[in-house]
């Protein structure tokens, strides 16, 4: 079963901030490669919504580690949709940042 993917507002803002920072610090190729990797990891969730491990405050909340990149994707897998909640750098204190609000 293929799920739809919905990027929540905070996740879209995270993705944009990551791209902007990497573009300024390392250039377009690095920013683009990182964004491509994030998109490819999220595409895995379309086919396998339970690919990540349980995390966060609710039973449905999960996280997917992005290999070779210092990011995790925080998401909720529902029946027909995967909602991407956040894209966070692994150095951040992430436990308190899993909330949707």
Kindly label every feature range from the protein language model:
Residues 69-72, 76-101:
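Enriched for short, Lys/Arg-rich terminal
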Residues 62-66:
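Short acidic-hydrophobic surface loop/beta-edge motif
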């Amino acid at each position: 079963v293929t799920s739809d993917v919905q990027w929540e507002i905070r996740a879209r803002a995270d993705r944009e901030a990551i791209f902007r920072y990497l573009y300024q610090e390392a250039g377009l190729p690095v920013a683009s490669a990182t964004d491509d990797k994030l998109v490819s990891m999220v595409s895995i969730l379309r086919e396998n919504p339970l690919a990540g491990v349980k995390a966060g405050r609710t039973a449905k909340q999960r996280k997917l580690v992005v290999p070779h990149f210092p990011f995790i994707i925080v998401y909720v897998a529902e029946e027909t949709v995967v909602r991407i909640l956040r894209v966070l750098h692994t150095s951040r204190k992430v436990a308190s940042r899993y909330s949707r609000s």
